């Protein structure tokens, strides 16, 4: 994970500086590992391991990738409690993990935490300073410009649309989400965009220049079908901006996202393999930190892709 610091510095310099610098950022990321190890031990000791639960699966795969637990789930490596970072956004990142920790990892693993509480935490994360600057830095790394017709899958409360419209002037912006209540909230949060309550891109029409898959793939129950339908809506030469937390990145953050209604848990390579079945990889920005980030394009030719 830390081997990617040079690439992160290149594309996410604002994010690093806002966190207080490289050393402060590393302290913050160390907390994500520490909390993940803590939550796993609590779940393991309570006999609450069920790998069918995305939250539990995310912890298991992340910690296995770091050789911190055995195949049977038994912890094999202790993690020293990190030093608290001093940077504002780095501290905010740690506090997010603390908020989730207060819910109780075992209760989350057993589905004993009210879903509304988890949804509220997710909404809070979208408005945190570290998350806002991270997403804005990612869009700049994609060299996004004005004038695009934009599609956002699983738009939830509209916070990504709000961020996008702060910096860009799209020709149009359409978000879709299966939850009508969230669509109503999104219309208030980002009045400059349009939102519709549908469960899939397969129910939509139109043509788009850009699709924002920023922390989205974990929600999709049937990703190949959804990507097929997204592909039909994307103009030839249109681009997908993909930012996907994965088991090779920040384990605590991935676990938090996975606890909030996730359908899938991916490695970065699984994300790439999935997307290249339907689209062409134009540029990989980063593999793991703070997420897998890449730009994909719909080929202009009509040839059938394998």
Predicted feature descriptions by range:
Residues 1-95:
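N-terminal accessory segments
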Residues 224-236:
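A short glycine-rich, Lys/Arg-flanked "PGG" loop and its adjoining helix->strand segment in the class I
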Residues 157-169:
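Conserved SAM-binding loop of SAM-dependent methyltransferases across substrates and taxa
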Residues 210-223:
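A short SAM/SAH-binding and catalytic strip from SAM-dependent methyltransferases
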Residues 245-262:
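Short, glycine-/aromatic-enriched active-site segment of Class I SAM-dependent methyltransferases
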Residues 70-142:
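Conserved Class I S-adenosyl-L-methionine-dependent methyltransferase catalytic core
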Residues 237-245:
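Conserved beta-strand signature within the Rossmann-like core of class I S-adenosyl-L-methionine
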Residues 186-187:
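Conserved SAM-binding loop
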């Amino acid at each position: 994970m830390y081997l990617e610091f040079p690439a992160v510095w290149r594309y996410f310099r604002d994010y690093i500086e806002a966190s207080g610098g490289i050393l402060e950022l590393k302290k913050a990321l160390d907390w994500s590992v520490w909390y993940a190890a803590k939550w796993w031990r609590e779940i393991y000791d309570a006999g609450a391991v069920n790998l069918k639960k995305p939250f539990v699966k995310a912890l298991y795969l992340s910690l296995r990738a770091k050789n911190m637990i055995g195949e049977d789930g038994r912890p094999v490596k202790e993690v020293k409690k990190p030093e608290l970072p001093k940077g504002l956004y780095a501290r905010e990142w740690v506090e997010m993990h603390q908020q989730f920790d207060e819910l109780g990892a075992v209760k989350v693993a057993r589905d004993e935490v009210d879903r509304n509480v988890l949804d509220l935490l997710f909404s809070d994360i979208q408005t945190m300073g570290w998350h806002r600057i991270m997403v804005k830095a990612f869009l700049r790394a994609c060299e996004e410009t004005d004038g695009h017709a934009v599609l956002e899958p699983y738009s939830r409360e509209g916070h990504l649309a709000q961020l996008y419209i702060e910096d860009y002037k799209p020709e149009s912006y359409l978000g879709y989400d299966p939850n009508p209540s969230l669509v109503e909230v999104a219309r208030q949060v980002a009045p400059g965009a349009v939102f519709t309550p549908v469960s899939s891109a397969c129910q939509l029409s139109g043509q788009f220049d850009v699709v924002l898959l920023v922390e989205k793939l974990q929600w999709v129950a049937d990703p190949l079908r959804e990507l097929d339908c997204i592909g039909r809506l994307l103009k030839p030469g249109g681009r997908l901006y993909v930012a996907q937390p994965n088991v090779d990145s920040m384990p605590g953050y991935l676990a938090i996202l996975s606890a909030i209604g996730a359908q899938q848990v991916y490695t970065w390579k699984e994300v790439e393999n999935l997307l290249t079945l339907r689209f062409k990889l134009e540029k990989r920005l980063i593999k793991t930190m703070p997420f897998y980030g890449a730009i994909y394009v719909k080929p202009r030719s009509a040839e059938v892709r394998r």
